[in-house]
Amino acid sequence: MSWAVRPAPGPGRAPGAALAPAPVLRSASAAASLAGAAVVWIALLGPVITLFFHVTPGTVSSALRAPGALTPLVVSLEAGLITLAVLVCLGTPLAWLMARGRLPALRLWEAGVLASLLLPPLVVGLLLIFMVGPLTPIGEALGHLHLTATNTLFALIVAEVYESAPYYVLGAQAAFAAVDPRMEQQAALLGDRPSRAARRVTLPLAAPGLAMALAVAWARAMGAFGAVIIIAYHPYGLPLQIWTTLQETGLASALPFALVLLVVALPLPVAAYLWSARARGRRRG
């Protein structure tokens, strides 16, 4: 026979009053959490929703029909696609080494990537001038290759790479780290070389995470502004087009270009997120 000790009634509590059942408390906590999450979700989406209320298809069409209005879109797409290619070619090996390598100064590598992430973009632009500007040794070397890292498409790509690379490298590192190393070891036991095991095992399993990292980097590159305005004021991409239109003709004229930037930048991250979520669901199932 077991005995239960009844808690003493507290101030204002009738001696026979029962404590609130645990399920009720859990339901109240869940409802409060859901309400808080809904408030945060609405607050985060508020600016986007507001933009759709203030911009109509007619205003977007009218803005894009203006002479030269499509040039910033073409420049942004061209620079963004080249930036993604650079990130995949250079950032993926670095991310793999950070996740799998046994480098003696691995923490130093990670600290360098984090430092570039935490630097304000405007500061990045200023530092790039002193690193790759025309009067620097690197700038002079680039000049021999007929490349200029200021006010050119090449300069825009450099700025976008510096602003977006940390997002891709850290995201790709997390994607590689999430793959169980024992899968690679099993492939090696079956006779696969490390490079073949990476292609057949690691990359397919890490692909959703890599796609998500690349999509975030794409959005970051498309919206790059701080470093761009310092070293690549020309040719205009969409962010600078929004800025100059705002300065010259006002907020109402800049909003259509803001909507175009969202339409170009956001679909890839959304698609990558849905693919990643589906892949996680398949693994759990």
Task: Go through each PLM region and give its residues.
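Short coil/turn motifs that cap or connect alpha-helices
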Residues: 104, 193-194
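Short glycine/proline-centered loop/turn elements that form peptide/ligand docking sites
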Residues: 179-183
